[in-house]
Amino acid sequence: VNMQYNQSAEGECQEENCDFTRSKSGKRIILILSALIDSRIAPLEFYALVFAMYLNIIFDRHSLEDVVGVGDVRKGKGWRNASPAKIIPFVKHLVRQMDQFPERMNTLYVLPVPSLAKGIWHFIRGFLKASVVDRVDIHWGSSSLHSSAPKTLLEFFDQSAMDDFERNRRSEFC
C-alpha cells in the first residue's frame, strides 16, 4: 500500500505542499501491489488488518474524504506473485475490515487482470456487497512482470499518475 501525501496542519492541500498523486477527479490515490502479499511471511488476515490500520492513520476522523484505490496485480521481480486464487481469502478479510470505513473508497481500479481470471472475479463478487461491487472497475490485460498498465486507465488518471504507479511498483523490486 502506498500513498504519498503532505497536508497542512488544517488538513488542507495547499499548492506548495501537495506532493501526492491525484486522480483526474481530484481524489488521493492509494496504490495496492497485491503481488507483494506473501502468506509465508504473515497470514492474509494480517495484510487486511494492516490495510485497515493504514486507512485509520491517513484519514481525519472528521473528514468525509474518499480516495481512489489502484490494485495493481502485475508481477514483481523478487515478489511472491501469488495466483489470484490464493488472494481470495485476503479479499474476504479486506472486505470485513473495510466495513469499518464505509464510503471511504470511491472507486477501486484493479489492473491489469488476465482474461483467464474472469471466473475468479465472478466468484469473488459473490462475497461482496452490491455497493462494493459497483465501486470496482476491472481493467483486463496481461499481468506479467513487464506488462504496461492498460491505456483505458488514462480516462481516470493522467500520464504522470500512470508513471508514478510504475515507478512505485518498480521501486519495490528486489
Q: What do the predicted segments below correspond to?
A:
Residues 1-174:
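Basic, amphipathic alpha-helical/coil surface patches used to engage anionic, phosphate-bearing ligands
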